A protein has these predicted regions:
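Beta-strand elements within well-structured catalytic alpha/beta cores of enzymes
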Residues: 3, 20-25, 50-53, 74-79, ...
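Short catalytic/ligand-binding loop motif for oxyanion handling, primarily in non-cytosolic enzymes
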Residues: 30-33, 38-40, 119-121, 135-136, ...
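Long, internal low-complexity/basic segments
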Residues: 153-155, 163, 171-214
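Polar, surface-exposed loop/tail segments
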Residues: 16-19, 61-127, 170, 177-182, ...
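Histidine-centered active-site microenvironments of extracellular/periplasmic hydrolases
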Residues: 8-60, 70
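Low-complexity, glycine/alanine/valine/leucine- and proline-rich hydrophobic stretches
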Residues: 124-157
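Short loop segments at secondary-structure junctions
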Residues: 55-58, 83-84, 100-102, 130-132, ...
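A structural signal for well-ordered alpha-helical segments within the folded catalytic domains
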Residues: 1-4, 47, 69-76, 92, ...
Length: 214
């Protein structure tokens, strides 16, 4: 109701077409899905963030993006709409995407990492494309505080989000997906290098990757 009041006021003031309105929040929370509460694990319920934007002068109403957007893209996008170009930032403006002109080189995959290590949610990193998700649970404390020591065999999860949108079936050992998984492992390494998250200062991680990255 209050959002409606805000939009109505902008209309009454005659500035709606020249005002950007954004509705956004933090990541979602688990409410029992996968046996979890809170967030942190890289399932869709906790990985996604709502982002609704209205800017009549530039953005067609009713449009829904399928492009992979990260929260580091928010600031460059709003800055560009305001006529400011941000430099030396990790995010990318998606003004073109919102206007229906997604760049040909727009990201096809995203990288995720959760560092803190607990038995209920082991430390992990992951890659997600529009359709597939690959997660590696390495379960090492490294230099993190607020961690636990526990016995855990490193493991992979792989989900086909088109066939299994609720991520109930780990298909990592399904031979049908072996070629896709091999390629995503390569892409995951490339993304880790791209963002400077290669664990070079952790010899135990290098040994772990050599053993399980097959």
């Amino acid at each position: 109701d209050n959002i409606g009041k805000l939009l109505k006021t902008l209309d009454e003031m005659g500035i709606a077409d020249n005002t950007i309105v954004v509705y956004v929040s933090d990541q979602g929370y688990f409410l029992g899905e996968h046996g979890f509460f809170d967030k942190r694990m890289f399932y869709e319920e906790a990985a996604r963030m709502p982002f609704v934007i209205r800017y009549p002068k530039k953005i067609p109403a009713g449009k829904r993006l399928k492009d992979l957007i990260l929260n580091i893209d928010f600031a460059p996008t709003l800055a560009e709409f305001a006529g400011v170009k941000m430099e030396n930032v990790q995010g990318h403006s998606f003004t073109g995407n919102l206007e229906g002109k997604t760049p040909a080189d727009w990201r096809k995959e995203i990288y995720y990492r959760y560092w803190t290590n607990h038995a209920i949610r082991p430390a992990h990193f992951a890659i997600r494309s529009e359709r597939y998700k690959l997660i590696f649970y390495y379960a090492k404390n490294l230099d993190m505080t607020d961690t636990e020591n526990f016995d855990f065999t490193p493991a992979w999860d792989f989900y086909d989000l088109e066939e299994d949108p609720h991520e109930n079936h780990n298909l990592y050992n399904d031979p049908k997906y072996a070629p896709i998984i091999r390629q995503m492992k390569k892409d995951l390494l490339n993304l880790r290098k791209e963002v400077g998250d290669t664990d070079e200062k952790y010899p135990e991680m290098q040994e772990l990757l050599e053993k399980y990255y097959k």
